[in-house]
Regions:
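Alpha-helical transmembrane segments of integral membrane proteins
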Residues: 42, 65-72, 105-109, 193, ...
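Active-site lumenal/periplasmic loops and adjacent helix-entry segments of GT-C-fold
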Residues: 114-253
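Low-complexity, intrinsically disordered or weakly predicted helical/coil tracts enriched
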Residues: 13-16, 67-69, 108-115, 146
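Specific aromatic-rich, kink-prone transmembrane helix
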Residues: 19-24, 142-143, 254
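Membrane-embedded, hydrophobic transmembrane alpha-helices
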Residues: 1-102
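Internal/C-terminal transmembrane anchor helices
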Residues: 100-120
Length: 254
């Protein structure tokens, strides 16, 4: 059963990544743009409206089920738009072919494996609910779809809350609750494993895109396929953050 949860989670996030890539390709309509740039643009475009609508839902304490319906309709609209643009303007997903695509991004797989191994090496704390604050987000994401008074109660205690606080402007748990509800897998696997790796993937996509943009101005490297290797810098940075937090603050950032 646990294996199925992992397989469903992996499949879901692969499809989500492909959706962002498809949407970003349609929005840019430019075959010369880096594929990572297309993923980032697709992610920002899709998530931005969901965040705006999500804030409205949380401020006015609307029912979660209506947000689920909105998310599904918005995603379908983005998908239809993407397919229409790709067909109408004859935009190619892989301008130089799939072989060139693999050559430009194969190192991403290595980076994702390194990050995944790091996660499992920290599995003890990960499955022990980590820090209290992290546990709050887990419980909130898991409980939002099943609460009658979705935004009028504290997801961890069930006590009634009133007014507007900083969490009202934070919609990532709301969006994640929709994805978790659709995938129907264990919250810990989906969030700690799936979302952690997928967010890392988005980070290296953004880093790769920035490197490509800088190179377009300064031309420090002629080969696009070598941009992926510069992304390795994120690995020692993350480890340095962890070591620094342990030695100076006594915290264990994961």
């Amino acid at each position: 059963m646990t294996i199925i949860n992992y397989l469903v989670t992996i499949t879901f996030f692969i499809l989500l990544g492909l959706f962002y890539f498809l949407l970003g390709t349609a929005l840019l309509k430019d075959n010369e743009k880096l594929e990572t740039t297309k993923v980032v643009i697709g992610f920002i475009f899709h998530t931005f409206l969901m965040a705006i609508v999500g804030i409205i839902f949380q401020v006015f304490k609307l029912q979660w089920m209506f947000y689920l319906i909105f998310t599904i309709l918005w995603t379908i609209c983005c998908l239809i738009y993407s397919l229409f643009i790709l067909k109408t303007y004859k935009v190619k997903l892989f301008n130089q072919g799939i072989k060139d695509f693999i050559n430009k991004y194969w190192f991403f797989v290595i980076l994702l494996i390194i990050f995944s191994v790091s996660i499992f090496c920290n599995a003890g704390r990960m499955w022990a609910d980590n820090l209290t604050d992290d546990g709050y987000y887990l419980v909130r994401i898991a409980n939002l779809p099943y609460m009658n008074n979705t935004f009028s109660a504290d997801a961890t205690t069930g006590f009634k809350i009133s007014g507007i606080n900083s969490y009202t402007l934070n919609t990532w748990e709301l969006e994640a609750s929709v994805y978790l509800f659709i995938s129907h897998v264990l919250p810990t696997v989906f969030i700690r494993f799936g979302m952690s790796i997928f967010n890392f993937f988005l980070i290296i996509c953004g880093l790769h895109s920035v490197i490509g943009k800088i190179n377009s101005y300064y031309e420090f490297d002629k080969g696009v396929s070598s941009f992926q290797y510069y992304c390795f810098i994120i690995v020692p940075i993350l480890y340095a953050m962890t070591i620094l937090s342990r030695s100076t603050l006594g915290l264990d950032l994961e």
